Structures are given as C-alpha cells and as structure tokens.
Amino acid sequence: MKKRKLILEDGTVFNGTAFGSDAESSGEIVFNTGMTGYQEVITDPSYCGQFVTLTYPLIGNYGINRDDFETVTPFIHGLVVKEYSEFPSNFRNEETLDEFLQAHNIPGIANIDTRKLTRIIRKHGTMRAVMVDEQKNEQHVIEQLRLAEMPRDQVKRTSTIKPYVVPGRGLRVVMVDFGAKHGILRELTRRDCHITVVPHNYSAEAILRLKPDGIMLTNGPGDPKDVPEAIEMIKQLLGQIPIFGICLGHQLLALACGADTEKMKFGHRGANHPVKDLLAGKTYLTSQNHSYAVNVSSLVNTDLELTQIALNDDTVEGIRHTAFPAFSVQYHPEASPGPEDTNFLFDEFLNLIKASKVKQGGEVYA
C-alpha cells in the first residue's frame, strides 16, 4: 500500500500507510477518545479544518451507512487512525470508510502510534499538521507549515447559505446554524417543533420577523470571537425570546452577556466526559467536541450564573441568565455519538418557552 507521512509543526514525523484520498492536506490536529461513532465524528461540522486522531485502535470495521451522518458533506481535513479495517462487517454498511473519504477528497493515514501522537498533543497542545507523500522533504514541509495561517472562516463554510423550514405542528423555533449537527434538528423534530433554520449572519430584526417562540444557537467550529455579527444578534434578542445555546452557541451567549472565552490546550473531544450539575446535584456523562471554553472568572459582574462544570478540569459546562430566559451548555445533549443523559435539556428548552409565553399572556400550542 502507498506510504504517507504525518508531520507536526514541532518537527515530529509519523510514517504510516495511506488510505482515503491521495490529496495532500493541512490542518489543526486534535484527538477524540470515543470508542464508537466514527461516522458521526467525521461528519460533525465542528471539526472543520482539523485532522481528527481517533484513539480507539480499530476504525472502519462497521463501514459507513446512510443513517448516521451529522452533515451531508464532511469538513475534516484528514483522519488519523492506528489500524484501518478494509473489510467492514455490519448489516447497515453501504460503503467502506476508505471509499467515503475518497469521495470527499479527504486523506487518511493508518498504522501510526496514535497513543504517542495523543500524548504529544496532550503535552504540547493542538498544533498545525500536514499529510504528505513519503517522498516530500520533511524540513521544507515543516518550515512551510510553521509559516501557514490557519483559516478563521469555518462558521461561514459550515453554515447554511439561505433559510429553510422543517415544518412541525408545535412551537416555532428559529435555529441559527453555525455548523449544526443533524442530531440537534432531529431532537427538535421529534418534539414536533416548527423549525426555521437560518444562516449564522442573520440579523436579530430578520429573526424577529419570523415570530419565533424560541431561539436555538447551534454548535459550530472555530473561535467564537470570529463571529462578531452573531454576538451582536444575540445581544439584541436577549430578553425578547427564550434562547438555548449548544457548544459554540454556548460560547456566543456568554460573549453576548459580557463574559469571555479562551482557547484550551487540547480541548474536550469524546463521548464520556463527566459533568456536574451544580443546581441539581447530579452528574452526567456527556459527548463533547470543543477547543474553546468560557473563562469562569469572567462570569463575575455579569448576569450569568454558573450551572455546570466538567469534573475532569472544572471547565465551564453550563450557564444561565439570571434575568432573561436563556441558558446554554458546552457539551452536546443530542449526543450523536455518545450518552443521552442530558437529552432532557431539549424538553427544558421547550418548557422555558411555554413558561415565557404564559408569563407574557400568550397562547401555548405545544
């Protein structure tokens, strides 16, 4: 099989076997510790522009199916695995992982020490990396990699271009798409919401014209500070319409309320991150994927209350506004993949909408 190199900006070189596309690619290298759900991970728009290292040692053994996509077009720039299974065995399998990556021009590399790679990322933090043919001059590639600028327009790439409607008979929810997973849409449709999905740069005025009962701020890739128009939009909507933010949406809500965000050393990516609910006194297992987090000290002197923390490192995992009907979480309550411990948050969102409508003297249709 064809050989390929994975080269990190710190000069570390991994020699492995190529699969997927023959294209050369660069991106930020991260790792995900989930044992299953590689299809959902690969198609999660929040990984836009990244090389995803899967720490579970065997990947591809159940192939790719049409049911588990989180977006139609994957946005990852590369896939890194220990061992790639060429012959998947699963009753839902429709194509191999290799065929899927080839179809979307995404390179992969296998037969490298993913434990060593993960330890490097944990020690030194996420960094730029490149996948190239084994013949390339390593020193030249490293020099070019260190000079490369990482893109900052990931949300623009992953957001819908124009609004569309997913009809339902219940509450009217406007979903602001920063790179939304289909799992969020599925949870709202299961609850019979009438959903209007709008682009990331939609104005507050345009959203209010849709007469929504609630606003969903979705997940998405990159630095929340790269989406200033969304922060301004949220500021204008606060207090008018109930808001629920997930992942990037959580960070944007925090920024809109005067808090701050910061980049983490290597982020949270996996399906078993424990989170403590400070209000309920309960602990949940959660699915997570984020490089940025809300700075806990920045919550002081804002109208935000800390509601949940990560048990591994005390990262802010949940906040709520003390005056307005708005709350958010850093993790993914829709899972996809992962545990569904916090799926009830979608019901809490709808209950918040209903309570707000009753308070305002309006009718509740669901």
Swiss-Prot record:
Enumerate the UniProt keywords alphabetically.
Answer: Amino-acid biosynthesis, Arginine biosynthesis, ATP-binding, Glutamine amidotransferase, Ligase, Nucleotide-binding, Pyrimidine biosynthesis
Q: Where is the Glutamine amidotransferase type-1 domain?
A: 172-359
User: Mind listing the GO molecular function terms for this protein?
Assistant: ATP binding; carbamoyl-phosphate synthase (glutamine-hydrolyzing) activity; glutaminase activity
> Which EC class, in a word?
ligase
Q: Which domain of life is it from?
A: Bacteria
User: What HAMAP family does this protein map onto?
Assistant: CPSase_S_chain
Q: What is this protein called?
A: Carbamoyl phosphate synthase small chain
